Curated annotation (Swiss-Prot):
3'-to-5' exoribonuclease specific for small oligoribonucleotides. It comes from Bordetella avium (strain 197N). HAMAP family: Oligoribonuclease. Keywords: Cytoplasm, Exonuclease, Hydrolase, Nuclease. InterPro entries: Exonuclease_RNaseT/DNA_pol3, Oligoribonuclease, RNaseH-like_sf, RNaseH_sf. Residues 8-171 form the Exonuclease domain. It is found in: Cytoplasm. This is Oligoribonuclease.
């Protein structure tokens, strides 16, 4: 399939915490869609190895959440480095979207971009500098159309691929019920 500069790349990461100066990436996934949000391709879900000391330094919320999902065990078993994961994602995305064309798409993606800047800078540069952040519409709907905001129920599984599909569904919800097209 030829690369198309109008496609959108959705990304989600799970991290050991929120501070890229102290925390690390443990899972990353991507999905490519057409501008109308139909899925073109689902990328690999990559679990990145981190040391026991990094995992043990997680706060209780992260230990509980990533422990219940099984992610901590997957991280310990993984041999994939951040650099290897970064290259696999760039190789995958390059098949569908030219570098520098897609905004980074997802929910609260400034956080993902901060971690990419710190640990996957080549992947960060693959994206356009613009963002398509579904959380912007969520915050506007919460203030301007509370019924629309409340009518989308998030599962918040904190699994990278599931969270991407939930973000796409949430944007479809706002497109249908909030935006006047």
């Amino acid at each position: 399939m030829a690369a198309n500069e109008n496609r959108l790349v959705w990304l989600d990461m799970e991290m050991t915490g929120l501070d890229p100066e102290k925390e690390r990436i443990i899972e990353v996934a991507v999905v490519v869609t057409e501008p109308d949000l139909t899925v073109v391709a689902e990328g690999p879900v990559l679990v990145v190895h981190q040391s026991d000391s990094v995992l043990e330094a997680m706060d209780n919320w992260n230990k509980s959440t990533h422990g219940k999902s099984g992610l901590i065990d997957k991280v310990r078993a993984s041999t994939l480095t951040e650099a290897q994961a970064e290259q696999q994602l760039i190789d995958f995305l390059s098949q569908y979207v030219p570098a520098g064309k897609s905004p980074l798409c997802g929910n609260t993606i400034s956080q993902d971009r901060r971690f990419m800047f710190a640990y996957m800078p080549n992947l960060e540069r693959f994206f356009h500098y613009r963002n398509l952040d579904v959380s912007t519409l969520k915050e506007l709907a919460r203030r301007w159309a509370p019924a629309v905001y409340k009518s989308f129920e998030k599962k918040s599984r904190h699994e990278a691929l599931a969270d991407i599909y939930e973000s796409i569904d949430e944007l479809k919800h706002y497109r249908e019920h909030f935006l006047k097209l």
